[in-house]
Amino acid sequence: MLGKKILGLPVAFALSLAGLVLLPAVRQNPRVSGVFLGAAAALCAWSALFSMQARSRRLALEVNLRKQHYVQACAQGSVLLYWGWHWPTVYESAHFILAQLLFAYAFDMLLCWSRRDSYILGFGPFPVIFSINLFLWFKPDWFYLQFLMIAVGFAAKEFLRWNKEGRRVHIFNPSSFPLAVFSLGLIATGASNITWGREIATTQFYPPHMYLMLFLIGLPGQYLFGVTLMTMSAVLTTYVFGLVYLATTGIYFFYDSYIPIAVFLGMHLLFTDPSTSPRTELGRILFGVLYGLSTVALYQLLGSAGMPTFYDKLLQVPLLNLSVKGLDWLARSRLLRAVSPEVIGRALAPHQRHLAFMSIWAIVFAGMNATQGVGDDHPGQWLPFWRHACREGRPYACPYLADLQVGYCRRGSGWACNEAGLLHVALSQSGEDLRRLDIAGAEEHFNQSCDRGIAAGCHNAVTLKNREGEFAAARPTIEDYPIILRGSKGEIRERGPSELYALACKQAWTEACADDPQKR
């Protein structure tokens, strides 16, 4: 398509963006409506200004549906659909995702035509927008930052380029770069609460068999683009570290998993962009190892600094993108050439090699799934593991257990309130948790437990007030189990007494095994 008429395309996208304010979900929030209209107006103004400046130019529009774009978009879209089925906020935010797509197309067109005469129209913005929305959303009152994040991503793709194997290509993935930049800004300003980042990282584990789902949706891209080695090396590096950490400390490094689901997602659909990753097979292995190790390091660094840890899979990707030339050079060096996978099976065609690596990855994943390395039943998500670890004096176990108990107390468990108070008292005496040095902080938990009908909570509130007597523990009631059995998977479906006792027994609540009427 040639001529000035194609300048109407970005305007059409901008007007479609403005038209979203007619939706009730947008109209009821004046700030969101203002952001949508403001973004649309800015795009229209840019288009008008550009139209006046480009009168003597012959602009072109080329349609090219690249396999890399639509395969990635299908995988990411599948995750959004499956995740949204179990966390309705995703579906409720569909108009926000649509707004970002409309903005991305208009912005990308105008930016490209500002620098050259041809624009390639395809599915390119889809994987960028879907990828960003799998990891970070700004809340409605701050949604203008979402548009700014998209603009930064496409600008980085257009302006930050280098020569790679004789071609002028972009350095950074257009979704991972703005994610890292804005993550740094949020950390620096302490403004993580204006995003859904924490909720995203938590709720992505809600759907059943999410690890298996991510494994399966990653297979087409691994076959077509040969990215298996990156994913497999990243997963294995993190998993092996977790095994060593467990053997050394007796607890799990990531607390409720060997590899958090959001990190596992990043290992499949974030850092594996074939355009911004190494070309050599050994380089891709090293790339994955570095991603796994850097995720571990960032999780520890952020956690120790009291910062949100959900940035652990985002911050390092641009630095890894900068390393790809060096990793490929290292992989081709005389030092490592002999151990490169390229020396094995040289007669195999590329897709045959991809299938071979995918087969190895499938065996590795099946083994991890069978040994609870991944899956829905990791013991670290349940209270009994942490109660046992706390009693054994494992590092960080008691403070983490206290946090879990406070969370269940807030959800309505009187037993958990009493346990949170008891552990608060113990931690105030041991000094292990700097947040719980004042014993008086246990009073609120005991009072909440008492208000919910736990006699031990009433007794402990009096004991704490008088500073004399012994504190008393209680047993979970049938009303507590729907709350304290939820783990990291969200609300449980079981509600009948027999089902609850059976589930509790499965999770190693020994008292539940004795209380189950069917086992008496």
What are these regions (language model features)?
Residues 392-395, 405-406, 411-414, 420, ...:
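Short helix-capping/linker turns of helical repeat alpha-solenoids
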Residues 46-61, 104-117, 152-168, 215-225, ...:
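C-terminal ends of transmembrane helices
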Residues 178, 186-239, 243:
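Internal active-site segments that recognize and position negatively charged phosphoryl groups
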